[in-house]
Amino acid sequence: MDKRKMKKLLILNLPYFLVGLFATNLGEAWRLAEGADSSAKILSFFHALPIALNNPLPSFHPLDLLIGILCGAGLRLAVYLKGKNAKKYRHNVEYGSARWGTAKDIEPFIAPKFEDNVILTKTERLMMSNRPKNPANARNKNVLIIGGSGSGKTRFWLKPNLLQMHSSYVVTDPKGSIVIECGNALLKHGYTIKIFNTINFQKSMHYNPFAYIHSEKDILKLVTTLIANTKGDGKAGDEFWTKAETLLYCALIGYIHYEAPIEEQNFSTLIEFLNAMEVREDDEEFQNPVDLMFEALEKKKPNHFAVRQYKKYKLAAGKTAKSILISCGARLAPFDIQEVRDVTAYDELQLDTLGDQKTALFLIMSDTDATFNFLISMIYTQLFNLLCEKADDVYGGRLPVHVRCLIDEMANIGQIPNLEKLVATIRSREISACLVLQAQSQLKAIYKDNADTIIGNMDSRIFLGGSEPTTLKELNQALGKETIDTYNTSNTRGNSPSYGLNYQKLGKDLASVDELAVLDGSKCILQLRGVRPFLSDKYDLTQHPNYKYTSDFDKRNEFNIEQFLSRRLKLKAGDEFVVVDAD
């Protein structure tokens, strides 16, 4: 037993020890008392008691010490039994302790400077620092925003947080309205603007997934992302075909990455490879041009990654190989469109630099047609992997500029592979993800059992209003019950009239399902991990200090995408240019 525990034990038992010493004087008084019977003995005890107490020191007579020990031990036993059998009362929280949060509850989580916070509601904010003075107040910056159509997900939450301008931003922009309204505000504050537009490829910068392949594992990641987001909405087919496609994609992309010139490392080359892969069911010995290319490569580099993958694919019989090629052709059909081939010919987005300096990347997508949304999902997948690797390999684990992904209409971009693992690990790298949904069930439809893991890694959850039953039921359960006071009255009339009043306590939902369904349009509910929930007003965009730079304030502030892209210098492979040092 260490000294601290010994000291604590002595302090707790000191009162009983003192009572025992005092009781030795009682034993001495009883011993000095005279009497033939018990009545006389008791009467004499009270006469002898003052004599025994005149001596402040305890009596060390064996009989007196025994009485002292019995009294001290008896008192300790009585206290122990009393405490063990004590009734546990929780006044005013008998049926639940739920309540709405107050300004005092959120105060420890707010940074002194307004611009150093994530805006959650009109009155609640969350500091951007991942290392507050008190570690107990540390929360990740992942946010789940749920609100039905017209609840103000963009106006009341996404735009105000974009205007905070404390990080680099990756913004999913349905219809392309956010960049038009906020783009100039970001430019005026020194941001680098990048745009990828799947609605109109003519108004888009170029994105080439092949530009971010640096190793064999990157090839497999790209193939996994491609397959996950081009499988369609129908019933899943035989897993054999998916694995066979994976082998062929890995082989062809591996060849392109390691053997083709840089200007040919893109999806256009991959499509040309597939087009050249003729298969004859009645002639197993037939070799197409791609077979000959891999045969030549095998002679030079027999252990080449692409060769190993291609040899496994070639184990398939002619009819099977033809089916695999048809599946690949159907999956890559969007890349037969010339605009798609052009926009993926080379890369301008430089995804791995978003954590180096303040940058805003707008991913414009259609909210009615999901044909090309798989490209957005591929960007997010590569973005997370690239930034995590750069944080670990270059910056010692933390990016110099925080990167916030504001993913509006999350359900429309397709599945981001391993998102449940990413949201749990990106915090330490100075990356955060904000998922905007119309209903919680959308997330479960895409990520199945992993949806709960994703939600569990969102320290902040905001409900802006909606009527989807599953969302309302789960929020109702999460808010809990409060204890309320009720009273009943009784009034009996007749020959002997009487009146009664009865008070009692009951448990009531802090917000019932029907109350959540009719939530005031100006209100929202915030849940912050470890803190009581808040019923607050939505943030008013017009009150933001940077609102005056947006086109919502003045139409002259509109960001012209076409003009912005036309002013940029476009360099292609093979172009000659002269670099002039301005210094």
Protein language model regions, located:
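A short glycine-/small-residue-rich loop at the edge of a beta-strand within enzyme catalytic domains
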Residues: F109, F114, F374, M410, ...
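General secondary-structure edge motif
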Residues: A98-W100, R125, K141-N142, R308, ...
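P-loop NTPase motor domains
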Residues: T24-E28, A136-I431, I446, K505-L506, ...
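Conserved long hydrophobic alpha-helices within structured protein cores
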Residues: F114-D116, L120, F374-Q382, L475
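Basic- and hydrophobic-enriched, low-structure N-terminal and domain-boundary segments
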Residues: M1-S151, R155-L158, K481, T492-R493, ...
